[in-house]
Amino acid sequence: MNKVLLFFAALFTCVGVYAHDYKLVIPEEIPSEARTLLTQRFTQMLQGGGHAVVEEGTPVNVSFEILDRMETPGSMSQVALNIVVKAVCEGVKAEFPITGVGEDEADAWLRAVKRLLPRSKEAQKFVQELK
């Protein structure tokens, strides 16, 4: 058990240090696993193939808007989320529409954030405008 906790502590520390250069500002309302993955996705996006797109310490504000939330009742209930993730960096704005369906809201968030691809058309456009 201690080894597992130590592994996750090291993982979160590495992710935090890795993304700290960009000062990602992510809302606390997002479940922790989804927030960690969101940090990884934006870090990958902003590194643009191994080269930093923005200078160290540049703030990147990430917000979200839940467009739709649906829940199916019953013993096999699921939650579906339609979300728009909004990013602002150096005056450049981008919106990334994502959806996720999961067993609960945290799972739906995680599945939605997995669909935020660092090399998507929206991400590439955001990175090009930052350069």
Regions found by a protein language model. Give the residues of each.
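Generic alpha-helix initiation/capping and coil-helix boundary signal
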Residues: 2-10, 87, 101, 105
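A structural "domain/chain start" motif
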Residues: 3-11, 15-49, 125-131
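Solvent-exposed, acidic/flexible segments
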Residues: 31-39, 78, 102-110
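Generic structural signal for short, solvent-exposed loop/turn connectors between secondary structure elements
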Residues: 17-22, 28, 32-33, 51-63, ...
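Generic cytosolic/nucleocytoplasmic N-terminal low-complexity/intrinsically disordered segments
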Residues: 1-2, 92
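Surface-exposed short loop/turn segments
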Residues: 48-53, 59-99
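C-terminal/domain-edge helix-coil "capping" segments
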Residues: 93-131
